[in-house]
Amino acid sequence: MEFSPPLQLATLIQRYKRFLADVITPDGRELTLHCPNTGAMTGCATPGDTVWYSTSDNTKRKYPHTWELTQSQSGAFICVNTLWANRLTKEAILNESISELSGYSSLKSEVKYGAERSRIDFMLQADSRPDCYIEVKSVTLAENEQGYFPDAVTERGQKHLRELMSVAAEGQRAVIFFAVLHSAITRFSPARHIDEKYAQLLSEAQQRGVEILAYKAEISAEGMALKKSLPVTL
């Protein structure tokens, strides 16, 4: 998936109030960007990092610029806009770039399901096959090439795992899909040191038939695509 129009370059001054970030452009202008990420963004928002932002043509937006990518001072590319996780996953499924999720004839988004009335990110269907329910999570937390999720305690994420276990118990296919949007990550684990309950539920979910997939995106200032399956350790 290519960025169109092309992203613009800046240097991060600070992120604040969760949804805002101040940057300085190469020609010395200071801008305030919308930050589309509610997480802790650990390691993704260090002052002095190079950032890339998009600009909306919607004149009604208070902050028309959106923070899309960070390039850390170590050189790693990180996609901080969490909306891209679902976009890239959908593109990869439709292109059959994810072998485990190929062979379906229908893809639906945001389908209500489960006792807790969640909305599943994607549901795949095909004749003579169980429906496949897919919950997508964006992974940007990295420590020494190890990717982790979540980067903060997530009761919502815990709820999603419970719902997926119920789906699997009903004989349908249930998948938790970790879209790794950090170029330095080479393997994935749940962040037990941050949210022990989530890590426990993920292990329980696997035991109850929920499939766990982690795929890494190739990221550049020109575009992104999910390409590579990563090993998962619980």
Swiss-Prot record:
InterPro entries: SfsA, SfsA_C, SfsA_N. One of its GO terms (molecular function) is DNA binding. The keyword Transmembrane does not apply. The keyword DNA-binding applies. It holds the Pfam family SfsA. Residues 201-220 bind DNA. Keywords: DNA-binding. It comes from the Bacteria. Belongs to the SfsA family. Binds to DNA non-specifically. Could be a regulatory factor involved in maltose metabolism. This is Sugar fermentation stimulation protein A.
